[in-house]
Amino acid sequence: RLTYYTPQYQTKDTDILAAFRMTPQPGVPPEEAGAAVAAESSTGTWTTVWTDGLTSLDRYKGRCYDIEPVAGETNQYIAYVAYPLDLFEEGSVTNLLTSIVGNVFGFKALRALRLEDLRIPPAYSKTFLGPPHGIQVERDKLNKYGRPLLGCTIKPKLGLSAKNYGRAVYECLRGGLDFTKDDETVNSQPFIRWRDRFLFVAEALFKSQAETGEIKGHYLNATAGHCDEMIKRAVFARELGAPIVMHDYLTGGYTANTSLAFYCRDNGLLLHIHRAMHAVIDRQKNHGMHFRVLAKTLRMSGGDHIHAGTVVGKLEGEREVTLGFVDLLRDDYIEKDRSRGIYFTQDWVSMPGVLPVASGGIHVWHMPALTEIFGDDSVLQFGGGTLGHPWGNAPGAVANRVALEACVQARNEGRDLARE
């Protein structure tokens, strides 16, 4: 077993590196646990088999090359594992995750295990096409520059008829929002079949565009029970002239997501990604996967927007960590910085960026903080923060747009929003 623990190993530029937070069972030394993680997530199995002799395990095995105790925690360690590039199929997030996190989390020697970060080398990231369009192309399509974009999730999320749904969309867009959004739970239920919804929403889009002179969008949720149906919905959205569709990438799966991203790239649709189910995976501090890994894999799989939490009203430490994965979504090159939870330097080599979407419990009073924290390249999404306005949807949308324009102008004139 311990041949998988190799502290003298020098990592290669082409290795995929992983940082695992391990909690070994009592009595299991951390080196043994680290070796077990490296073995089980690469070439090893529970015993030595004679067919090991038919290949060069030295060439293909994962190696645990460093272990450090976690500050302030008893019996928790960060194990660093290096995987040779040949273990993974090119351009497949599905295969990457199946290999690295597929089996090892049920391991008996471990009480808990969490994948904190992955370093994706350029040699591997270059096999992915990434986001269908990216931040710059999206701005050019929408002709909107120099400010964050505004969105709104239509509420109540379930129960509206297609016609009333379209009316709510129209009021929000007419009031000044850039986007409205299907809730992630809206697919094609008996009271709101997808085709009816798409038609009424398209009508709302074009009416509000004609009246405001701005390009408008609505994230039409194309998520479906199977891939063919999903693509069919995306095709219909494109035929209606909608600029953007949406996908729930964790419940839909990475294979479906990459398929949809390919379609969107080839047909000029933007792709909005919702992270429904993420907390099942990333909520526990000592088990599962950190959201920054889900964010990195999404950037590879493909999406132009992804929900990334809000920061506002959370603890200060959370803020730095959230900004860490916001940078991982947007920037080309991100330096290692443990205070922000970034375990490895990540070089995306000009893969297009993803716009982080701030949504969940935010309203106009948060606007100065949000513009300060997220900057221009983001989507600020107010659901109840728009629709909860005492005068209705359109005035709620106006309030958001006015607040945003005021904050952006104040910032451009040199005022310190954070201090104020």
Swiss-Prot record:
Entry cofactors: Mg(2+)
Any GO molecular function: ribulose-bisphosphate carboxylase activity
N6-carboxylysine: residues carrying this PTM: K181
Major localization listed first in the record, in broad terms: plastid
Active-site residues, as the UniProt record annotates them: K155 (proton acceptor), H274 (proton acceptor)
Pfam families recorded: RuBisCO_large, RuBisCO_large_N
Superkingdom: Eukaryota
Name this polypeptide is given: Ribulose bisphosphate carboxylase large chain
Phylogenetic placement of the source organism: Eukaryota, Viridiplantae, Streptophyta, Embryophyta, Tracheophyta
